[in-house]
């Protein structure tokens, strides 16, 4: 779904006055009922992530980590069935999955008398049954399933969307095997025309295309692809600000779905 910049700014302004909780997400949907729920969720997630980046450091000081861990221990001692970690994350205005990671890492340090590897932590976050403490495992699980912006569940959904197949394409991993460093998700073996524009590559983004993220992608990825492979198509599956689709004549198109009016140039030339 495409939004005007004015529509996007209105949504972002609303999000600036609410806490990043599921209750706030419901309020967002009620406030903007005509907008796609998936688009609203993506904008909600991105605005939340901007906030998390600004406050991330303060949650990882030694003092903060110890405070969170002791509050977790005291909380489950009083009531092990209560969503202690989830409520702590909401109180601290911090992502539940990230709070879960902090407490899990502190727990493992205490158990193993050493700093646990990221691989081990990630594995336990994906599958809490590996955690050697049933109460903590349940607390971690509650955080994971109630986090709509971070965590393994969100990563899994994004991975699925970004890997939608294209029968005319050479996939990113194949390109990297050939020695390319920065590569789009797909290179078209046969160029196609979309809305009158020639396309050589497709980049898939499981997010909403707002101004800050799109400008970063242009600088870090899209213009590099354009220089190496020619004109291409970017699909923002959750929509984008329509004013950002301003580089078509230079060779970068934006869409919010896979185009249905593709003309394969090889087929078109054979008909002549």
UniProtKB/Swiss-Prot annotation:
Pfam families attached to this UniProt entry: TPD
InterPro entries: CDIN1
Disulfide bond entries: none
Superkingdom: Eukaryota
GO cellular-component term (any): nucleus
Swiss-Prot/TrEMBL keywords: Cytoplasm, Nucleus
Cell location: Nucleus; Cytoplasm
Keyword Secreted (UniProt): no
A GO BP annotation: erythrocyte differentiation
Function: May play a role in erythroid cell differentiation.
Name the record gives this protein: CDAN1-interacting nuclease 1
Native organism: Gallus gallus
Gene: CDIN1
């Amino acid at each position: 779904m495409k939004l005007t910049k004015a529509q996007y700014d209105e949504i972002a302004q609303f999000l600036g006055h609410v806490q990043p909780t599921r209750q706030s997400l419901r309020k967002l949907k009620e406030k903007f009922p005509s907008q796609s729920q998936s688009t609203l969720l993506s904008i909600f997630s991105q605005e939340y992530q901007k906030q998390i980046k600004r406050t991330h450091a303060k949650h990882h000081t030694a003092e903060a980590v110890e405070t969170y861990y002791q509050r977790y221990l005291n909380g489950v001692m009083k009531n092990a069935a209560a969503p202690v970690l989830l409520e702590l994350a909401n109180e601290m205005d911090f992502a539940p999955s990230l709070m879960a990671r902090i407490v899990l890492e502190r727990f493992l340090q205490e158990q193993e008398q050493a700093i646990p590897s990221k691989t081990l932590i990630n594995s336990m976050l994906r599958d809490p049954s590996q955690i050697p403490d049933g109460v903590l495992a349940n607390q971690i699980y509650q955080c994971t399933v109630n986090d709509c912006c971070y965590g393994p569940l969100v990563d899994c959904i994004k991975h699925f969307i970004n890997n939608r197949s294209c029968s005319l394409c050479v996939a990113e991993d194949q390109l990297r095997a050939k020695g390319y460093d920065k590569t789009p998700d797909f290179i078209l073996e046969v160029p196609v025309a979309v809305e009158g524009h020639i396309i050589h590559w497709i980049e898939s983004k499981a997010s909403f295309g707002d101004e800050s993220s799109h400008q970063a992608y242009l600088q870090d990825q899209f213009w590099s692809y354009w220089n190496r492979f020619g004109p291409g198509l970017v699909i923002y599956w959750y929509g984008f600000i329509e004013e950002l689709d301003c580089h078509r004549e230079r060779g970068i198109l934006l869409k919010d779905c896979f185009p249905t009016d593709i003309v394969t140039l090889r087929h078109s030339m054979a008909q002549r």
